């Protein structure tokens, strides 16, 4: 169980370091796409995955971690309140929570209940460690199946000019234009304009995060993926994660922020990373 939690913490920390960097907006218009102009298609994207309507999400979660060919599966809960917090709770047996990761605009809180320790780190500290501009809203968009521009909370009709857009077979590819350190690519599912993959990578290295979305089902008036597959590319050891979601609702009746018990020991982020790398 201890190894499972350490692998989970490793996945979460790595995701934070890979995503997000500031971008410069510029314009390029596309030809017609399946009878739609680029502007019309962009409006479909905003309607489906522009992030304007999903304010809360709660789901049962089965998380599968594959590190160097070794697979670990744990159950838990995913909770999100847009603009406030992302909570991942791990409760493998009888609904008893053993670990929690809480990400908010203020920073990241990781609680290891088995060892009664926790890490609390601000986004400023993460930026210094990663040497990149990190944004809460970028990570939130990945979990909510939303297209995004780093540093911007919501997209509008005017933001089409920030992307290159082209047909790739029956799908549509969008690339954020004129970024500096990171490259951002979104792959849309044909005329349905459902986001099927987000790809974030370093321009001067082979490191990248692929976040794929599958098994779309109705959630309110929209479609939402019940399966998310993450692949960390460029690492010495292959690392993948799969979120399988069920019982999805828009319930927001839960505490946004976790209060840590005084009995828990606060551990520095550097110490935690060192412990994980030693495993």
Where are these regions (language model features)?
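Sec-dependent bacterial lipoprotein signal peptides
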Residues: 1-21
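Extended beta-sheet lipid-handling architectures
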Residues: 54-61, 73-75, 89-90, 96, ...
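C-terminal low-complexity, charged extensions that often adopt amphipathic alpha-helices
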Residues: 129-161, 273, 279
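Short, cysteine-centered beta-strand-loop-beta hairpins and adjacent loop/turn segments enriched
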Residues: 66-70, 95, 235-236
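N-terminal leader/targeting segments and the immediate start of mature chains
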Residues: 21-72, 269, 273-279
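Gly/Pro-enriched, hydrophobic low-complexity segments
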Residues: 155-265
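Edge/loop elements at the starts and ends of beta-strands within beta-rich repeat scaffolds
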Residues: 49-57, 69-72, 79-84, 101, ...
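An acidic-aromatic
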Residues: 85-137, 141
């Amino acid at each position: 169980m201890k190894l499972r939690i350490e692998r989970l913490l490793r996945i979460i920390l790595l995701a934070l370091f890979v995503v997000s960097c500031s971008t410069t907006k510029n314009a390029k218009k596309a030809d017609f796409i399946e009878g739609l102009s680029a502007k019309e298609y962009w409006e479909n994207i905003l309607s489906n995955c522009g992030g304007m309507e999903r304010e809360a999400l709660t789901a049962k979660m089965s998380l599968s971690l594959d590190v160097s060919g070794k697979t670990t599966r744990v159950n838990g809960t995913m909770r999100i309140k847009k603009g406030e917090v992302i909570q991942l709770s791990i409760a493998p047996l009888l609904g008893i929570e053993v670990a929690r990761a809480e990400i908010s605009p203020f920073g990241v809180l990781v609680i290891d209940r088995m060892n009664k320790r926790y890490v609390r780190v601000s986004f400023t500290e993460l930026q210094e460690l990663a040497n990149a501009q990190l944004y809460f809203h970028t990570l939130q968009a990945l979990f909510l199946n939303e297209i995004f521009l780093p540093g911007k909370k919501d997209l509008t009709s005017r933001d089409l000019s920030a992307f290159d857009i082209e047909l790739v077979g029956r799908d549509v590819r969008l690339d954020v234009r004129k970024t500096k350190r990171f490259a951002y690519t979104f792959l849309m599912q044909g005329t349905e304009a459902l986001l099927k993959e987000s790809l974030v990578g370093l321009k001067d290295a082979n490191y990248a995060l692929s976040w794929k979305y599958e098994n779309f089902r109705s959630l309110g008036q929209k479609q939402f993926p019940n399966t998310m597959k993450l692949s960390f590319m460029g690492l010495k050891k292959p690392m993948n994660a799969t979120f399988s979601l069920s019982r999805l609702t828009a319930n927001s009746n839960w505490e946004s922020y976790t209060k840590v018990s005084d009995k828990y020991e606060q551990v520095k982020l550097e110490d935690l990373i060192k412990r994980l790398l030693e495993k």
